[in-house]
């Protein structure tokens, strides 16, 4: 009988590429895999369906906050969560109710599956994993983020609740993984157990051909994320462009938060405003294609939270896969890759616009240097930072130990 693994995503699968890669690897190895997600936004439901079409594993989505299938229950869940957050804000008392009533729906579905192993991938699914542990189901946790350290300190955020869940699940888990050596070291110091590291690299089979050499407008530079908003290094970029002649173009891909795009444009020097383009977020299936149409990738992560400082972002490894030279800020996670990347990744401080300008303009002014960096980036992805290599590290691929 096949081993049954349940991956607890608790999110839209189209926005959870690490789970997709994990499910692919496990199912290819002969494991029966089901991913348990959640519908938050109606417009992403069809994208989820497109992504899982033809997969060897099953995807089931529990109705989430804005799913019409929730009906009146959605209002009750949202009200309870709002009251729990208000209690935390006013009194400092944090509760699991802040994780949302949807966690109980996820647990009900998980219990019905009776998996041999359940793998948690988010703060909410940590709670599900803990409840499964109480019922003697084996669990694992993948810290694709350090969940309790994701946010800048907010009075109502349940960081202490999530930290307790992290400790409980990590203590009893069959195994734990995370996205960088820096994160593994930090988690190990806090909880006494060091997760294994699986970089969030991407399959070579999905890599498009790198872009041709720059044309008359100069190198095409790219910043990409799910959301376009403050605290993501864009203010650093705007200031850095003030130190450069407009010898290259910049594309920013992400869904603007409120009127942030307008505010950001006002910060760009006037000479640059026709050189900077903002594009709304793409389908996940289109991300690598748009990246590969550029020459330089901007990985301007900030160190305003421990999670942001310690993780290795998706975009950095996607840039390498697509043959882009990378300008990166010196967060602990990004330095971990940059140290091994030579000229393919150049690093500046998170508050050093002049340093960033020097990197960008240096590549724009020296095509040979840029081409060398791009070739090295592609080589690194082919030989080191690709999913074909990282997938082999997955503990779930090892035969289960006999009791």
Predicted regions and their residues:
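Nucleotide-activated donor-binding/catalytic signature segment of Leloir-type glycosyltransferases, i.e.
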Residues: 218, 254, 262-296
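Acidic donor-binding loop of glycosyltransferase active sites
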Residues: 174, 290-309, 324
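Glycosyltransferase donor-sugar binding loop
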Residues: 41-42, 224, 249-264
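A short, well-ordered alpha-helix in the C-terminal region of glycosyltransferases
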Residues: 355, 362, 369-384, 393
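Membrane-proximal helix-turn-helix segments that form the acceptor-binding/catalytic region
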Residues: 22, 93, 97-112, 127, ...
């Amino acid at each position: 009988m096949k081993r049954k693994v349940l991956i607890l995503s608790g999110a839209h699968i189209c926005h959870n590429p690490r789970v997709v890669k994990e499910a692919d690897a496990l199912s290819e190895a002969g494991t029966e895999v089901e991913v348990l997600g959640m519908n938050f936004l109606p417009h992403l439901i069809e994208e989820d369906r497109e992504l899982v079409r033809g997969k060897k594993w099953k995807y089931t989505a529990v109705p989430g906050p804005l799913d019409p299938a929730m009906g009146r229950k959605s209002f009750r869940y949202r009200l309870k969560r709002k009251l729990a957050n208000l209690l935390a804000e006013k009194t400092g008392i944090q509760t699991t109710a802040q994780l949302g009533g949807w966690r109980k729906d996820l647990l009900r579905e998980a219990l019905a599956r009776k998996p041999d192993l359940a793998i948690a991938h988010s703060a909410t699914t940590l709670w599900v994993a803990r409840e499964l542990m109480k019922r003697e189901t084996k669990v694992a946790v993948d810290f694709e983020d350090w969940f309790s350290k994701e946010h800048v300190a907010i009075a109502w955020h349940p960081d202490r609740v999530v930290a307790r869940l992290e400790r409980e699940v990590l203590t009893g888990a069959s195994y734990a993984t995370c996205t960088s050596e820096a994160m593994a070291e930090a988690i190990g110091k806090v909880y006494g157990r060091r997760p294994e590291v699986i970089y969030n690299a991407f399959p070579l089979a999905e890599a498009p051909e790198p872009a041709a050499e720059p044309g008359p407008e100069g190198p095409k530079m790219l910043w990409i994320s799910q959301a376009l908003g403050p605290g993501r290094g864009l203010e650093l970029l705007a200031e850095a462009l003030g130190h450069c002649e407009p010898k290259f173009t910049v594309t920013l891909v992400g869904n603007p938060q409120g009127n942030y795009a307008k505010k950001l444009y006002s910060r760009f020097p006037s000479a640059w405003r026709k050189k900077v383009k903002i594009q709304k977020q793409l389908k996940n299936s289109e991300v690598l294609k748009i990246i590969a149409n550029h020459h330089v990738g901007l990985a301007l992560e900030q160190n305003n939270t421990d999670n942001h400082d310690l993780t290795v972002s998706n975009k950095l490894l996607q840039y390498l896969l697509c043959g882009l030279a990378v300008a990166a800020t010196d967060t602990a996670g990004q330095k971990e890759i940059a140290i091994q990347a030579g000229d393919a990744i150049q690093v500046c401080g998170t508050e050093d616009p002049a340093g960033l300008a020097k990197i960008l303009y240096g590549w724009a002014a020296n095509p040979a240097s840029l081409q060398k960096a791009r070739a090295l980036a592609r080589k690194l992805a082919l030989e080191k930072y690709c999913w074909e290599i990282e997938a082999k590290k997955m503990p779930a691929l090892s035969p289960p130990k006999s009791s």
